[in-house]
Curated annotation (Swiss-Prot):
It is found in: Mitochondrion inner membrane. One of its GO terms (molecular function) is metal ion binding. GO terms for cellular component: mitochondrial inner membrane; respiratory chain complex III. Heme b b562 binds at H84, H183. This is Cytochrome b. Keywords: Electron transport, Heme, Iron, Membrane, Metal-binding, Mitochondrion, Mitochondrion inner membrane, Respiratory chain, Transmembrane, Transmembrane helix, Transport, Ubiquinone. The cytochrome bc1 complex contains 11 subunits: 3 respiratory subunits (MT-CYB, CYC1 and UQCRFS1), 2 core proteins (UQCRC1 and UQCRC2) and 6 low-molecular weight proteins (UQCRH/QCR6, UQCRB/QCR7, UQCRQ/QCR8, UQCR10/QCR9, UQCR11/QCR10 and a cleavage product of UQCRFS1). This cytochrome bc1 complex then forms a dimer. Component of the ubiquinol-cytochrome c reductase complex (complex III or cytochrome b-c1 complex) that is part of the mitochondrial respiratory chain. The b-c1 complex mediates electron transfer from ubiquinol to cytochrome c. Contributes to the generation of a proton gradient across the mitochondrial membrane that is then used for ATP synthesis. It comes from Pachyptila turtur.
Length: 380
């Protein structure tokens, strides 16, 4: 009998083991769809980004005009740009749901997979930040100035580091050029890290909503989950295209329709919505270095999650107190996101400070305590 090429060919064999014959738990829910959605987001962003890069000029005098030219004169340039800009929002929606799923169902106990995932998040955040600077509007310029300036809070080397990053004494042409280079490069790094992420995942196999070993009940990935993923793609592309076609600027900042002007500061400098929670934590601390450390900690705390797991059960499926705490954390993050979009004045300052304290308390203190408490409750 002739060998099956799908199973014998060195390259096809890898694809087969990852996407076709992969043994998958039969009970994984739609929360497990977000991984593949992130993959399709990445592919869409790389494709639209490549098409945009063909018409973009990384020069302070031409960047704004080149983006306007793309939207006005390039065939479907407006659509490509709108899909790329709003695609970033959907990328973050998916990654936040994906992290939330991992947190709720204890997927972080696959430490290597979790850690590569956190590195992926950090790389994605860096990519989105440098990408936001490229249209060279007011919010692009001032966002770049404010965020890069945070590095100057690092003792001794801070100022040197910032000027080195800028390529001068302020955000200018060298900054824009290197940000474009980074924005082009980083998505391919993300693609590489994704393969590492999947390699680690396939070492152990997928977790499932019950958090129990599922080796006795696995089904092939294709056709069951390929079909389920295609449904997921459809359900994601529908709101993405709706947003890109009907209200493409809904999530953007009107300030970015004004070309960058170093002499005029916008009344409210704020990042895109997906960074607002971290921005609110940064602003809630009056000290510059303290704010920067809190900002870094707000994301880096994810590396600690596997070590803070004290419960005997892996998932929160049968842990009602942890569930309650989880949804309080979600609400808290939404409050932080809202506060981050508001001006720095009473009552938003105190709300932001309380929400920031709550965020760290829930993750560092309450989750381990409640996990241990639920272990005690299992004995009664």
């Amino acid at each position: 009998m002739a060998p099956n090429l799908r199973k014998s060919h060195p390259l096809l064999k890898m694809v087969n083991n990852s996407l076709i014959d992969l043994p998958t738990p039969s009970n994984i829910s739609s929360w497990w769809n977000f991984g593949s959605l992130l993959g399709i987001c990445l592919m869409t962003q790389i494709l639209t980004g490549l098409l945009l890069a063909m018409h973009y000029t990384a020069d302070t005098t031409l960047a704004f005009s080149s983006v306007a030219h793309t939207c006005r004169n390039v065939q479907y340039g407006w659509l490509i740009r709108n899909l790329h800009a709003n695609g970033a929002s959907f990328f973050f929606i998916c990654i936040y749901f994906h992290i939330g799923r991992g947190f709720y169902y204890g997927s972080y106990l696959y430490k290597e997979t979790w850690n590569t995932g956190v590195i992926l998040l950090l790389t994605l955040m860096a990519t989105a930040f440098v990408g936001y600077v490229l249209p060279w509007g007011q919010m692009s310029f001032w966002g770049a100035t404010v965020i890069t300036n945070l590095f100057s809070a690092i003792p001794y080397i801070g100022q040197t580091l910032v000027e080195w990053a800028w390529g001068g004494f302020s955000v200018d042409n060298p900054t824009l050029t290197r940000f474009f280079a980074l924005h082009f490069l980083l998505p391919f790094l993300i693609a590489g890290l994704t393969l590492i992420h999947l390699t680690f995942l396939h070492e152990s196999g997928s977790n499932n909503p019950l958090g129990i070993v599922s080796n006795c009940d696995k089904i092939p990935f294709h056709p069951y989950f390929t079909l389920k993923d295609i449904l997921g793609f459809t359900l994601m592309f529908l709101p993405l295209t709706t947003l890109a076609l009907f209200s493409p600027n809904l999530l953007g900042d009107p300030e970015n329709f004004t070309p960058a002007n170093p002499l005029v500061t916008p009344p409210h400098i704020k990042p895109e919505w997906y960074f607002l929670f971290a921005y609110a934590i940064l602003r809630s601390i009056p000290n510059k270095l303290g704010g920067v450390l809190a900002l870094a900690a707000s994301v880096l705390i994810l590396f600690l999650i596997p070590f803070l797991h004290k419960a005997k059960q892996r998932t929160m499926t049968f842990r009602p107190i942890s569930q309650l705490l989880f949804w309080i954390l979600v609400a808290n993050l939404l409050i932080l996101t809202w506060v981050g979009s508001q001006p720095v004045e009473h009552p938003f300052i105190i709300i932001g400070q309380l929400a920031s304290i709550t965020y760290f308390t829930i993750l560092l203190v309450l989750f381990p305590i409640i996990g241990a408490l639920e272990n005690k409750m299992l004995n009664y």
